[in-house]
């Protein structure tokens, strides 16, 4: 939003009054499509097929007018919705409005985030590495080795539409915008017959707006959860994110406590007293880990179920939240299989007369790379077949030799970079072998030569291309280990995000 600094210069006390007029600003939709102020490209076009026509805010105004004129909350007796409003272009029209909504309702969030950053600029400057995905793994290594039980929880979604709008009321105080947003959500949700279908279409066509609603819901849920956790714990949380102020927050907390246990807040604080409760969220899931007995984990499990059911009207079955022992459970976490194993350490004790060995058992977090899912991803991206045998990439034969090699090297480098924390390196060596041989087969196919002849011509140069950068990095970090193959784990603190579409050849980690 740096292209539009004028929107962020609004007076703090009046900023919410300006949100509704922004719906009719063409620059908002240019920002939504990341086209700057270029008015030759947008989805605000008259024809659904022609993407090069000029902006037409007449469509937006017409849609909003017709939405206000209709009674959208009336549903027929058989449960179906007769919706002539959207017509054949319902996906297009909903996308037009959702893109504008997404940018506009993000403005109050962005203003508060910027002000929060200004207050904590020095603290943020000291810890830029905490934004890396790999930064969570050293934390798990330090903490999980001392814990005993773990619950892997899927955060339920979607919530009720009115709950979503009420959640946004604490952020967006513009009544007109909220009213229009409520109308749009009801109209859009009722346009589809099954929940599964509308969620899929909503995610594909309106990912920015979908993520905004989801993040606001998660922010609300975690605000309550971490508030109770911090108040009930012997030690305050030091790694939780920034949660902004909202109206009547403490009133809601008190009401939630009454609904849950029917007692005062001091009782619930002692009810959940635990100095070793840890919470991690990632990719729509959360992890709860604790020490000693599973009794406390059971209490937190039912607390979460009641929180979702009574506060967000989302159904969640307690039986689907399992409590597992860390020593007997392998956690599929951000592309790694993680589990806690007992490692024996033998120490020789020498006295004047006797010497004896002491075997100490120590817990250690092991992280390994799941080789089969990686091979499946490479297979879907056409680097190998389903059995893991390398194949050529015919779509790349039109490129130059240097471009082909650079592309394969970049893919191999990204995979090695992200999975460098694996305790076992053999799976990574197999992935490198697949990519290297796929590159050779692609070059041989381009030059109409055999793989054997092409390898003889290249010699060891191609292998050096795939291994050079990793060797340089290790030589800088571990000078003593540079002369031999380093087998230890390395966590990089410069990976802010990854793409979840690991099977998509054009949108996965393989193309970065």
UniProtKB/Swiss-Prot annotation:
Q: Can the keyword Transmembrane helix be found in this entry's annotation?
A: no
Alphabetized Pfam families for the sequence: Intron_maturas2, MatK_N
Q: Choose one Gene Ontology CC annotation of this protein and give it.
A: chloroplast
InterPro entries in the cross-refs: Domain_X, Maturase_MatK, Maturase_MatK_N
UniProt keywords, alphabetically:
Chloroplast, mRNA processing, Plastid, RNA-binding, tRNA processing
Q: Where is the signal peptide?
A: none
Q: Give the organism, scientific name.
A: Oenothera glazioviana
Family matches, as HAMAP family: MatK (MF_01390)
Report the locations given in the UniProt record.
Plastid, Chloroplast
Predominant localisation class: plastid
What name has this protein been given in UniProt?
Maturase K
Describe its function: Usually encoded in the trnK tRNA gene intron. Probably assists in splicing its own and other chloroplast group II introns.
Q: What family does the database annotate? A: Belongs to the intron maturase 2 family. MatK subfamily.
Gene Ontology BP annotations: mRNA processing; RNA splicing; tRNA processing
- GO-annotated molecular function: RNA binding
